[in-house]
Each structure stands twice: as structure tokens, then as C-alpha cells.
């Protein structure tokens, strides 16, 4: 079952789905696995496994640090794929690769997609790859039933959103505000407007991310978006209180 069908099926019984995020190898793969166990117990539906990169341009300070520390500890792309394989065999949530195009470029597009497929991934999120430069990659992806997740932003023109919508597959990642990940996003009419504009340009499910951090944020998105994407707030909870803080954070969202 692809991402689109998976989300639509789960939405029959859930007002909104939740997608979590870990940076592979930070603080360690063992702690990643513990975090994923907590997420599954809390009812998380999808998870991004971020392959660390030295210049994560879409990420805020906390994730930049996580990427840097993971690389310094010796994390490799091969280790990330091996971890993904372990994760997809163990957990029921769907797994997406998140990263930057340099990772794909270094492997080669066909080799990257083959490894992703073999590791049980459902698709990928590459925020620094414009759709105009991704035609071949997206075609190869769909031949393997892998979904390239497209990002839509508030600053995109209607013509741009239409073009992005035509390239969308699996789900769309609606970026809730300008800038990088990490800062709190105010849930207001600007988010409603973004969601409406995205909906007008794609028929695939819609996820909203960047600054989603609380149950009230999830409640705001219910009936509007299909997936709430949570990254920095969860990692901050781990940084502050490790597994206990992480568990308390996800329990506070009351996902299930």
C-alpha cells in the first residue's frame, strides 16, 4: 500500500495522522530505536528517517547540530539504510527517507532508489531539489512505487503550486511558515489559507509541518490537513529529558 492509500485508509478512523522524525545516528542509533518505540506506542503513523548531511539548508539550529553530531560520530549512508531496513521490519508505521540531494547524487539516482526500496522505505523528502531538476528521479521513483514528497510553501505563486501539484505523489508537505524548522508556528488564518491553496492544486493527502508542537496545534489542523508533521519539538523533548521527556511529549499529543 502506497503512502496515499495508507493515509486515506487511516483517515477513515483518525481525525489527523502524525508523522515523526529522527536524525539517523543522533544521539545514537540505539536511542533512535528507543524513540521510534515510543512513537509507535503513542500512535504515530509515519516517520521520516533523516540521513545526516553537512549542510542541511532547511533545518533549524537543533537539527543542524544533530546532523553535525551524527556525521562526527561516523554515521554513513549505508548505516542509515541498514537502520531503515531494521525499522521497517520492526514497526507498523510507514517510513520515508528525508535528506538532501547530495546524498542521492553521491550514490547515483538509480542506486539510491534501489537501496530505498530494498530497505522498505515508501518515498523520500528532498527539500533542496527543485521539481524542474527532478524529472528523471521522479519517473524512476514511480516505476518502483516510491513517492517523491513535494513541498508547497506560503510564498509559492498559484502557478507554482499548480506545477508542484502536478508533480505530487503520495502526499504533499505544506510548509507552515517561512524559514527553517524549529520555531513555533502560530496556527491562524495564514495556515488555513495555505491549506486551501494546496488543496486546490493537488488531490493527494496533505501534511503540514514546521513548528507543529502541541495538542492544540493538532486540534487546529483536524478537519483541514491529513497529517501533522512533528520534528523539532520532539527532539527538544529528548534533549531536555531523554526517553522520559520524549514519552511525555508524545503522550501529551493524545494521538490515538
Where are these predicted regions, by residue range?
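Glycine-rich phosphate-binding active-site loops on the catalytic face of alpha/beta enzymes
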Residues: 44-55, 123-125, 129-133, 172-182, ...
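Short beta-strand/loop segments at the ligand-binding rim of alpha/beta enzyme cores
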Residues: 13-19, 90-100, 141-151, 199-210
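C-terminal helical cap(s) of enzyme catalytic domains, especially alpha/beta-barrels
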Residues: 59-67, 235-256
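N-terminal amphipathic alpha-helix/helix-capping segment at the start of soluble metabolic enzymes
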Residues: 1-21, 85-88
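Glycine/Thr-rich beta-alpha phosphate-binding loop at enzyme active sites
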Residues: 65, 73, 151, 161-200, ...
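Catalytic cores of alpha/beta
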Residues: 29-41, 156-167, 208, 212-228
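Active-site beta->alpha loop and helix N-cap motifs at the rims of alpha/beta catalytic domains
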Residues: 46, 51-53, 64-129
